[in-house]
Each structure stands twice: as C-alpha cells, then as structure tokens.
Amino acid sequence: MSLNAKNKRSLDYCLQWPDFCQSKKASKLIVKLNKKHPKRRHYKDPEAKHYDVLFKGVCKAVTNGITNQLICDHIDLKIAPGEFVVILGKSGSGKTSLLSLISALDRPTSGVSFVCGRSTICCNDAQLTSLRNKNVGYIFQQYGLLRDLNVDDNIKLAVPFKKRHNNNLEELLERLELKEHRNKKITKLSGGQQQRVAIARALIKEPRILFGDEPTGAVNVDISKKILQFFVEYNRDKGTTIVLVTHNEKIVELAKRVIKIHDGKIVADYLNQRPKTINEINWV
C-alpha cells in the first residue's frame, strides 16, 4: 500500500518523536540553569579588573542526548595576576573541563565568568578567540605540533606574521634549550623536546596567563623537573600568571596556591605557605 505525501510526513514525525522527546528531556538541566542564572549581554563586575580569572557560581552542563551531567558545579574562583596555581584532581574529576572554562576555550552554561576582564558567557566565538589570542597561552596535553614543520616555524605559528621577528623567540629558545634544534622537524625530536616546543609556542606572544593541561604527563621525571623549574623561574621573572592542571601530587609542592577538584566541584583551595624547590621534592 502506497502512502500519500501527507501520510508519509505523519509517519516521519511519529518515527522522529522518541528522539525529540529524548533530546527535550536531556536539555532540561541546561534550560533550568539558564533560568536560574540568566545570561546578561553586557554584564559587568567591579571586581573583574582586579583578577585574571573571576568566577561566581559557574556551572557547565553537558548532555549526550540521554543523560545530563554537571561537569563543573557552582564554581567560585578568583585568580590574581602573577599567581602560580596548581589544580589537582584525578581522571574524570572535572579539572580539564574547568581549565577549558578559565582559559576561555569554552563558555559556562550559567554563572558569572570573567577572564582578563571580559565576560566569557557573553562572548561569541570570534570574541572568545580574540580574548585568547591577546591574553592566553595554552599547552595542550597532546602538544598539537605540526609534524612537517621545524621548531622555529611551529613556535612562530602562534603569532601574527607581522610580529614574527619577535625577540622573545631567541630568549625562549635559550631558556628551553632548543637553540641547537631550531631547524629540526618535530618528528626528529624526543618527547621532552616536543613538550618544550609546545611551551615556547604558548609563550611566544607573551600572554597574560599560561595554562597547562598535564604539562609533564608524557615525559620522564628528569624532563619533568626541568620543565617545572622553567615554569617556576618564568613566573618569578616575568610575573606571568601560571595555572597547571595535573593528577600528580608531587607538583602541588611547587605551587604557591593549590586547588583540588572532585566531581566537578572545588573541594579545597589553599595557599602553600612554603613552596618547595625542585630538589627538595622526593620524586620517587
């Protein structure tokens, strides 16, 4: 039996109805959060100018079409210029999701969120990109380097063409022990050398804040110690705000401030009264 056009459309709607209901149910949490904490297009907060990161009641909800999950749950956070912060959490704790929000890689679902004085919840994609380009350096867990380019070219990709004579390049190559490798392709470098290239690329534009997602997770202890020593010295010498995310409790001992996260919530936030030096930490 053939179906006319009207009956065929009706059948299509019936077949699509379960998916529609599922999607509608899955978005309830996001709708509820937005009603509770409505977005304000031109929201300002007098505190924002004093902090590199200012979060008040920030939530991030995600859905896979079936279940809802708060991956960041009512986060209150202030990070002042020049701080050295380590965010500690186990796998799945929400630390990388939080890092995406405070680095302006992602927007919250609700709450008040400022990064470098800008309300990220009010920014469109182009505005978020501009905010990151001007203020944020980010070291990705998987480095994100272009394998067919050499060290110099990978680093220079992070800055506009007209600024690629940046004197900061020579300083970074020197401090990160990359000068003798500058013309080598990424495929010819060790894992530790590739990590240092990723760090140089994140810092070449002299960002206001440097974020690192498990910056020593893929290298051995000796390389980790060198990289962490670089972060400590760079924070001290340049005054750049540094925020590192890790599951390694040893790294916490270096930080001036420690934030612990569990199930998308900040469960501890304290100052380290006496950060240890690299050599004082028992790395075994």
From Swiss-Prot:
Keyword match Oxidoreductase: no
UniProt keywords, alphabetically: ATP-binding, Nucleotide-binding, Transport
CDD domains: ABC_MJ0796_LolCDE_FtsE (cd03255)
UniProt superkingdom: Bacteria
InterPro entries xrefs: AAA+_ATPase, ABC_transporter-like_ATP-bd, ABC_transporter-like_CS, MacB-like_ATP-bd, P-loop_NTPase
SMART domains: AAA
Name the UniProt record assigns to this protein: Putative ABC transporter ATP-binding protein MG468.1 homolog
Species assigned in the record: Mycoplasma pneumoniae (strain ATCC 29342 / M129 / Subtype 1) (Mycoplasmoides pneumoniae)
